[in-house]
UniProtKB/Swiss-Prot annotation:
Pfam family, one: Antimicrobial_2
InterPro entries found in the cross-reference section: Antimicrobial_frog_2 (IPR012521)
Record's keyword terms, sorted: Amphibian defense peptide, Antibiotic, Antimicrobial, Disulfide bond, Secreted
Keyword field contains Secreted: yes
Positions of disulphide bridges: C27-C33
Stated name of the protein: Brevinin-2PTc
One GO term describing the cellular component: extracellular region
Annotated tissue distribution: Expressed by the skin glands.
Domain of life: Eukaryota
Length: 33
């Protein structure tokens, strides 16, 4: 239902935000950016 779609959207946003954060951290650590 609507709640499930909302939950899935939130999970998707959280995952992509987490990936971005991890990329920034990795970038600072190994200076590949």
């Amino acid at each position: 239902g609507l709640l499930d779609s909302f939950k899935n959207a939130m999970i998707g946003i959280a995952k992509s935000a987490g990936k971005t954060a991890l990329n920034k951290i990795a970038c600072k650590i190994d200076k590949t950016c």
